[in-house]
């Protein structure tokens, strides 16, 4: 398996282009199932997860192509398989997002229960509850979510918790349902707004996206569209945490600062100089950062997907930070690896107390999930000596050529390639 070898101590300087948002691209690719016409999508990141999604759609009969210019075209005019099998779904939780489009357009779906990062239980029960409210006959059978409906009927649905993928799935199901659907307690993430904007281009009638109450008036059919995926706010935040920990002065191009309010506030509190424009962010850091605590919340709160990266910055900060993880259980698996590098961190339930040390020391560490792997890279950049990060297939799920971008900023980082174990 591939590894990253990082020699710490180099400051980061220069410019880097932020890729399209993984968490926007995945549901947008699934939206291609809602029409027989082509979707032409720009700024789709080249990631393991997007490649897996394209393979899954291809398995269903969708024509899915990535051009040399980075444009992805999907056309679901010859769908002949309404099953999402375990061998593809097991590596990516977002594959549950084919459920809503398949059910809405074809009246049936058989989707294996998903995998992805091992962060808590992340149940799909809210998806099932919502589809049932829309009139689907839906059940779990032999590890699959099995659903069918002649035509979905609009309904008022309040999820028991705020769920991003649940909101996306129900949104895609409702656009072709008969009548009006109201999603209460809906997630408000920018990626949901991006999906809704695409669906509107396709002919959907949606209001309230970006709020906790989304109203969808179903239509008989959708048509093709062109769309550009929004920039990845988590990738942008990750690079800003990296310069905060390692020091330096970087500019992020193709960034969306208006989606990063909570993250930028924390980084300013940590001592970074932050400047923004319509599509760029500059982050600069001299000396050690100040310790800054955070409580993760649904958008527009501080993102759970930024918790591990902020913790990596706090490990080398002046002072003590308290971080509380409110979204997922079992999301501190990076802590034991950071401790191997000399980090001083105590965990009590959902709370982490991070006491900054002057310098981490390089060590061999192992990535356990997507954002944890990013935190270990940040720690390696700030550490003395050499760090080797194993299991970086987690990193490749959500970051487009991270080591290449960091190297362009002056980091001493190399990918060591190796064969997968038998």
From Swiss-Prot:
Residues reported in the UniProt entry to bind UDP-N-acetyl-alpha-D-glucosamine: 93, 122-126, 305, 327
Pathway stated in the Swiss-Prot or TrEMBL entry: Cell wall biogenesis; peptidoglycan biosynthesis
EC number(s) on file: 2.5.1.7
Modified residues (2-(S-cysteinyl)pyruvic acid O-phosphothioketal): 117
Transmembrane segments: none
Pfam family, one: EPSP_synthase
GO biological process, one term: UDP-N-acetylgalactosamine biosynthetic process
Keywords assigned: Cell cycle, Cell division, Cell shape, Cell wall biogenesis/degradation, Cytoplasm, Peptidoglycan synthesis, Pyruvate, Transferase
Catalytic residues (positions): 117
Keyword Transferase in annotation: yes
GO CC term (a single one): cytoplasm
NADP is among the record's keywords: no
Gene3D superfamilies hit by this protein: Enolpyruvate transferase domain
InterPro entries: Enolpyruvate_Tfrase_dom, Enolpyruvate_Tfrase_sf, MurA_subfamily, RNA3'P_cycl/enolpyr_Trfase_a/b, UDP_GlcNAc_COvinyl_MurA
Stored SUPFAM superfamilies: EPT/RTPC-like
CDD domains: UdpNAET
Chain residues that bind phosphoenolpyruvate: 22-23
Catalytic activity: phosphoenolpyruvate + UDP-N-acetyl-alpha-D-glucosamine = UDP-N-acetyl-3-O-(1-carboxyvinyl)-alpha-D-glucosamine + phosphate
Location in or out of the cell: Cytoplasm
Job of this protein: Cell wall formation. Adds enolpyruvyl to UDP-N-acetylglucosamine.
Annotated PANTHER family: UDP-N-ACETYLGLUCOSAMINE 1-CARBOXYVINYLTRANSFERASE
Entry's family note: Belongs to the EPSP synthase family. MurA subfamily.
HAMAP family from the UniProt entry: MurA
Protein name: UDP-N-acetylglucosamine 1-carboxyvinyltransferase
Biological source species: Bordetella petrii (strain ATCC BAA-461 / DSM 12804 / CCUG 43448)
Gene (UniProt): murA
